[in-house]
Amino acid sequence: MGSEISKKDITRLGFRSSLLQASFNYERMQAGGFTWAMLPILKKIYKDDKPGLSAAMKDNLEFINTHPNLVGFLMGLLISMEEKGENRDTIKGLKVALFGPIAGIGDAIFWFTLLPIMAGICSSFASQGNLLGPILFFAVYLLIFFLRVGWTHVGYSVGVKAIDKVRENSQMIARSATILGITVIGGLIASYVHINVVTSFAIDNTHSVALQQDFFDKVFPNILPMAYTLLMYYFLRVKKAHPVLLIGVTFVLSIVCSAFGIL
């Protein structure tokens, strides 16, 4: 492997990251755009090593949902590790471990703080007929957009400097990243998978027990989303079922159960 990644390559990566959500879907979220953005540099790193390139692309095509303005930092970090030939499990583990926290940080800074504050200030200007309002908001938004290039360079720089430490502690990092990754996935299950059983049982003429609210949620909150996710994982991993088939089955089950008053 071995290649020379230039600043121009990293800058290009930063701009390509702007299309992170161009192929957004609910199976892999941003995986398509993430892989597309990194592909030119991955080709430069792996050159004629098609199995290596295939493995890298396969890892990058796995589920990812992170903040579009900060994704460049993660891309730069992963590229620096790819360039140094780090273990695939370590690279994959760090990606899984970091995309969730990066999403949380980005949402807190940009969507929930900076942009709402700027929107309030600029709306005040605009309501008074001041042209500065829309111009200022647009300028801030553009600044945030172009900062993704800077974040990409920061991620690449940090990755290169930290690579020796990663090599020395790769097994520990991989294990820690795996544990953190599983924790993140658990949070994603609770956030994205919703099953609400409305079925209830009458005890007498005036009292009834709601199956989910009075039983499942009291014993183990979110047990149904977790159970259904594990069932889908079983069909995907063990039975090798096609994801589209499972999505279709889930869609049909939702309609049928809703029609019969179960969900």
From Swiss-Prot:
Domain PTS EIID stretches: 3-263
Query: Organism's domain of life?
Result: Bacteria
Give yes or no: UniProt keyword Cytoplasm.
no
The Gene Ontology biological process terms listed for this entry are:
phosphoenolpyruvate-dependent sugar phosphotransferase system
User: Which Pfam families does this UniProt record tie to the protein?
Assistant: EIID-AGA (PF03613)
Q: Which PROSITE patterns match?
A: PTS_EIID (PS51108)
- Primary role: The phosphoenolpyruvate-dependent sugar phosphotransferase system (PTS), a major carbohydrate active -transport system, catalyzes the phosphorylation of incoming sugar substrates concomitant with their translocation across the cell membrane. This system is involved in N-acetylgalactosamine transport.
Record the organism.
Escherichia coli (strain K12)
Q: According to its record, what are the GO cellular component terms?
A: plasma membrane
UniProt protein name: N-acetylgalactosamine permease IID component
Show the InterPro entries listed in the entry: GatZ_KbaZ_carbometab, PTS_IID_man
Q: Where in the cell is it found?
A: Cell inner membrane
Give the main location. Answer: membrane
Organism lineage: Bacteria, Pseudomonadati, Pseudomonadota, Gammaproteobacteria, Enterobacterales
